[in-house]
């Protein structure tokens, strides 16, 4: 089966300058996602989509393929789906390659490993999902903010259960998205159809979007 991973890695970033190449534990941030993809036993093609030559050079050195995207697909407001479209069109035109499964791996999740990826894809196949995403689960109570107060979303405070028996809440962590290519083409969305959820440990769900996040994960890795 042809399983393609697409790693979006644009040069611009509001929170951290050239974030995808920032050094984390003596390695560029890009390293962790590229290596997780290359070490996967299921993914058989790894492509980094970028507009930046330094990022492209680093990706090639790490062993990934590179597809350079136009600047209009590398702005702060650019959506991910057109980037996926661009990669698919490029691979079809220049390599006559059409994947059956698309896996989207974001560099902001450096603690996601090849094991996580393979477990998610195995679950997707086993349960016959059209798409799957990763996240973490917590047994907790949710509240909604209204104009002048808050109200519980999923329980009655007068009959409050113990936390362990509260509803399991699922939170997306952005580390893994996978979908059948035919579903992506039909829906124009990274996840669609029958969607599955792969649970990752909370401590592996770090997401780097700011200097504060970067400091936190450096501290975590040091310990």
Question: In which residue ranges do the predicted regions lie?
Answer:
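Catalytic donor-sugar/metal-binding loop of nucleotide-sugar-dependent glycosyltransferases
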Residues: 186-206, 211-223
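Short, high-confidence coil segments that cap the C-terminus of an alpha-helix
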Residues: 43, 97-99, 128-129
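Conserved SAM-binding loop
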Residues: 22-23, 48, 104, 206
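Short phosphate-binding loop-to-helix
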Residues: 53-103, 112-115, 119-122
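A short, N-terminal amphipathic alpha-helix
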Residues: 29-45, 57-58
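N-terminal nucleotide-binding beta1-loop-alpha1 segment
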Residues: 1-17
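Short active-site oxyanion
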Residues: 42-47, 203-205
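Conserved core of the sugar-phosphate nucleotidyltransferase
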Residues: 82, 107-201
């Amino acid at each position: 089966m042809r399983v393609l991973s697409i790693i979006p890695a644009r040069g611009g970033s509001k929170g951290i300058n050239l974030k995808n190449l920032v050094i984390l534990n003596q390695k560029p941030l890009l390293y962790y996602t590229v290596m997780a993809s290359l070490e996967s036993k299921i993914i058989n093609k790894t492509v980094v989509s970028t507009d930046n030559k330094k990022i492209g050079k680093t990706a090639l050195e790490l062993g990934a393929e590179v597809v350079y995207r136009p600047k209009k697909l590398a702005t702060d407001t650019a959506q991910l789906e057109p980037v996926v479209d661009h990669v698919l069109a490029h691979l079809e035109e220049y390599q006559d390659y059409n994947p059956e499964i698309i896996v989207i791996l974001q560099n902001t999740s450096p603690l996601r490993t090849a094991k996580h990826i393979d477990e998610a894809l195995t679950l997707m196949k086993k349960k016959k999902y059209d798409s799957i995403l990763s996240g973490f689960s917590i047994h907790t109570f949710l509240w909604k903010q209204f104009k002048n107060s808050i109200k519980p979303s999923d329980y009655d405070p007068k009959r409050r259960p113990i936390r362990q028996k509260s509803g399991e809440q699922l939170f997306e962590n952005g580390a893994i998205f996978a979908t059948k290519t035919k579903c992506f083409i039909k829906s124009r969305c990274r996840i669609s159809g029958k969607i599955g959820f792969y649970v990752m440990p909370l401590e592996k769900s770090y997401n780097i979007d700011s200097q504060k996040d970067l400091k936190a994960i450096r501290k975590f890795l040091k310990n």
